[in-house]
């Protein structure tokens, strides 16, 4: 398709937040959208192949985590044949999609961002609240802001990647780089905890001209379905994106057994990602694929805060409470282990931390706007966390400073809990819990090097971490000592809340491939570069001067 100009993208900026204060139009808007969506439940969601709704008659249910008797959505689950059909539909649609000029692909996602910012903001937030248990603010920064930022900034970063061309051309030669889509299809496996991430797992490879199969989380099907519908309304061709809710094992098996499998875009647990990588690796060894698949994944974390004796105590406490207990500790970046100097601990940190955590209100999003902590996502998560709390209550090495209770009579509610231990190698500092449980270790002020070693070696993860200190010499020392402990490192700020366009997100070690969502780096994983040398001069002799 011809394009007779080099178009310039509109100015790309972060979506400004709405604050939803008392009596505001924003609060009125989200409450209205929430009630309207609630009245429509349960929503019936099909498998979508080549733009056509497919009813499989194998039904799954997404339930409301704060009212688990309430069914949010009944969704048709794709079987093996449906996945095969979806792959073939994607491959048929590949030529049309990848031949569409970048300006048109960008326009689709810029329009999608605009639709979310305006027409669908409250609806997408409401689906995220009802289906995934977020309060208004957590839904806003996810489904009302971050997803928009991903869609907008991706176009900027893609434009910059395409503009990356060879710096030199010898006389009579024009050298160029072309960034081709991958040969085959990309498989996107999305998580429950961020609607924005689910959208970006599909949108990032799509923008680069790839066709995508999107498998939504069983616990976030509704919000992912709305995102799919928004992409289609924005002009995305039917063949470019297939929507295939279903059993993760069955869907993945079909995708990974197909010779045209070209890429995996994943957010989820470390154990699952390792298993998927192993399957792909075995298939590569057996020569199953046409090309080596690109594997991009962001997984677990056991994220830390280190509080030095020079830290401003109130700020360090506030940041710890927010990082540990916003969205019930179910962010990949959530604070899970806290290392506090003895001086800071005894000079106000302990009392302030305990007071702040005990003051947090727990409950459903709109029953009380003051509710800070909501439910964990499902029964399995609740059971795991309840077992941890019961074990902690009888463990002689642990003191429960706050919380410790769990109740699933109506929803999956776990109290925000603080566990103190003198054993820095205890399981509570090692294992990812993915819930509102914060483990604290108090270190001697002169043992800073030792605590750095603990932070760096206690867990296999390397996702996020923060240090709190006013002494700049200490800041420099800790920044250097903890260089590989976190892919996102914060100084005097919480370890959550990375902003697209400001802090590209991702970690290494067991936390993933560190390809940095919200940056051009991740887009570069979904292209296959071609170097082109265009020579204008004629060759007139086989021999070189040295041959004479």
UniProtKB/Swiss-Prot annotation:
Xref: SUPFAM superfamilies: ALDH-like
Transmembrane segments: none
CDD domains, sorted: ALDH_F4-17_P5CDH
Catalytic center residues: 298, 332
Cellular-component GO terms for this entry: cytosol; mitochondrial matrix
Reaction(s) catalysed (UniProt annotation): L-glutamate 5-semialdehyde + NAD(+) + H2O = L-glutamate + NADH + 2 H(+)
Top EC category: oxidoreductase
MF (Gene Ontology): 1-pyrroline-5-carboxylate dehydrogenase activity
Keyword Flavoprotein attached: no
GO terms of biological process kind: proline catabolic process to glutamate
Record-marked site positions (Transition state stabilizer): 193
Modified residues (Phosphoserine): 391, 394, 396
Enzyme nomenclature, EC number: 1.2.1.88
Recorded family membership: Belongs to the aldehyde dehydrogenase family.
Protein name: Probable delta-1-pyrroline-5-carboxylate dehydrogenase
Originating species: Schizosaccharomyces pombe (strain 972 / ATCC 24843) (Fission yeast)
